């Protein structure tokens, strides 16, 4: 599939800046093809690793039903959204990624993914603490992996101009 070019390409973030937004972010919105043709967009925590995003969820529900029906998804993270009332605008920075999601099946890949997520959100935990948390939540846990096919980052033109002025 060909992905659309961003219309305002002067506002395009570099690949490094785009990856940095995903590495820094703590939550985003996962958009899926939902029931009866309605989009289903759900806020979710994640971890970014290379060209993959990892999410956790329960072993059943709307999200998994949608993914099983159609594994294509988009994921959006807003890094900055500073409202500037006197200019009738916002100074924003965001990323959108498109890709395909799969449920991680084997215990090994599921475990590797949940450990990445745990290290992101609880970086100072002990190995024993992380192990206890993973074991406690293991039975109902489903891990998802989104392989990114295309992603772009964009920022407000005012931020682009400010960078050039430095």
Model regions: which residues?
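Extreme N-terminal tail/first-helix region
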Residues: 1-24
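Charged, gly/pro-rich active-site loop segments
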Residues: 2-10, 82-166
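Structural motif corresponding to alpha-helix initiation and N-cap regions
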Residues: 15, 60-61
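A generic structural signal for nonpolar/aromatic side chains embedded in well-ordered alpha-helices
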Residues: 21-22, 66-67, 117, 146
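Short solvent-exposed loop/turn micro-motifs enriched in small/polar/acidic residues
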Residues: 23-25, 38-39, 88, 139
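Short beta-strand segments
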Residues: 25-59, 75-76
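Broad gene-expression machinery/nucleic-acid interaction feature
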Residues: 27, 41-43, 72, 92, ...
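Helix-adjacent hinge/juxtasegments
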Residues: 63-92
């Amino acid at each position: 599939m060909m992905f659309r070019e961003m219309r305002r390409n002067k506002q395009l973030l570099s690949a490094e800046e785009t990856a940095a937004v995903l590495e820094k972010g703590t939550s985003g919105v996962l958009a899926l093809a939902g029931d009866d043709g309605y989009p289903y967009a759900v806020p979710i925590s994640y971890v970014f690793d290379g060209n993959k995003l990892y999410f956790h969820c329960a072993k059943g529900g709307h999200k998994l039903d949608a993914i099983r029906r159609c594994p294509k998804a988009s994921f959006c993270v807003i890094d900055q959204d500073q409202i500037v009332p006197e200019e009738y605008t916002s100074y924003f920075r965001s990323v959108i990624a498109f890709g395909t999601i799969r449920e991680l099946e084997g215990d090994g890949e599921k475990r590797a993914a949940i450990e990445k997520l745990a290290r992101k959100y609880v970086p100072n935990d002990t190995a024993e603490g992380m192990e206890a948390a993973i074991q406690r939540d293991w039975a109902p846990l489903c891990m998802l992996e989104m392989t990114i096919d295309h992603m772009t980052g964009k920022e407000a033109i005012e931020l682009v101009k400010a960078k050039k002025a430095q």
